[in-house]
């Protein structure tokens, strides 16, 4: 006769029970190890630029805070006092020919490299877009002379254009088309991307490839007050500069730092000038929402909308 089970144990645990307990106990410790492996940082310049040197009173600093929900990298770092710019390239297995420089935000005092850099790059990598995440030079705390801001802007734009050139130079090895190299950015990084798209490039040496973008993505960008004049300078009859590239703009209605109304006005000016542009204003998200997870159902859809816009702009070819 088969003994009846009483529900009691003899005090011994079998191997499967032990392994289960060990696995559950280790979960909190294992979580940080699941952060995505990121590509290495490489120096942006072979030699530090002598035209626009930016010195810092202290060495480069980094601080970390908890990563936002759904972060592909699992990291959330802010770099400050950056005097030596670097870059990292995310390479998909099957590149579709599109290359994109990503400029994180941080008010030009910080560079939020993960939530506004690597996270988007990892998302785009899954969609076969090659991305270069730029850690550009930050603004020193002691920029007080009247012309210092202009000096800094020239320096940081030089960093962004150098990143574009790197993708163009390495296009054959990266599987890119040199006429499909764009720039995008978040907040201050969006302003940087905008300035590279709107302002003509200082003439590079004869042997240098162009640092002008073929398209631009502006994600809750800072909009300067003179943006209308910048557009007019590039689109006025007789202007020697090439036309303004296609531009994608997105923001949240409740953004208090970079108000959506300024993006709407900027978009209207682009349309009036005949620039190919697309604009999205989401009902929720506030400022600094990165990929948008946890900030609003529609807000979290913006990366897919950006990728679709690249298709509509004939950057990504439909299959």
Language-model-detected regions and their locations in the chain:
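Short beta-strand/loop motif that positions the catalytic acidic residue
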Residues: 249-251, 255
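Short amphipathic alpha-helix adjacent to the substrate-entry channel of hydrolases
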Residues: 114-132
């Amino acid at each position: 006769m088969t003994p009846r089970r009483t529900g009691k144990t003899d005090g011994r645990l079998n191997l499967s029970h032990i392994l289960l307990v060990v696995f559950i106990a280790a979960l909190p410790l294992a979580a940080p190890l699941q952060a995505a492996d990121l590509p290495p940082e490489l120096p942006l310049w072979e030699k530090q630029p002598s035209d626009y040197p930016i010195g810092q009173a202290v060495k480069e600093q980094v601080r970390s805070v908890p990563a936002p929900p759904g972060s592909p990298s699992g990291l959330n770092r802010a770099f400050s006092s950056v005097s030596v710019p670097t870059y990292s390239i995310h390479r998909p297995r099957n590149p579709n020919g599109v290359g994109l420089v990503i400029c994180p935000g941080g008010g030009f005092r910080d560079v939020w490299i993960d939530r506004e850099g690597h996270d988007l790059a990892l998302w785009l990598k899954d969609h076969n877009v090659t991305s270069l995440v730029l850690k550009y030079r930050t603004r020193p705390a002691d920029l007080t002379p009247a012309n210092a801001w202009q000096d800094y802007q020239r320096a940081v734009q030089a960093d962004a254009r150098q990143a574009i050139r790197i993708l163009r130079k390495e296009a054959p090895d990266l599987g890119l088309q040199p006429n499909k190299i764009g720039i995008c950015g978040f907040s201050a990084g969006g302003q940087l991307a905008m300035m590279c798209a709107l302002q003509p490039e200082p003439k590079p040496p004869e042997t240098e490839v162009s640092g002008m973008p073929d398209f631009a993505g502006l994600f809750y960008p800072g909009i300067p007050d003179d943006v209308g004049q910048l557009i007019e300078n590039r689109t006025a009859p007789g202007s020697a500069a090439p036309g303004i590239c296609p531009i994608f703009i997105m923001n949240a209605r409740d953004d208090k730092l970079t108000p959506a109304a300024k993006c709407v006005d900027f978009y209207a000016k682009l349309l009036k000038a005949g620039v190919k542009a697309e604009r999205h204003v989401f009902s929720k998200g506030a400022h600094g929402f990165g990929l948008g997870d946890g900030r609003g159902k529609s807000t979290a859809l913006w990366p897919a909308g950006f990728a679709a816009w690249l298709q509509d702009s004939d950057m990504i070819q439909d299959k």
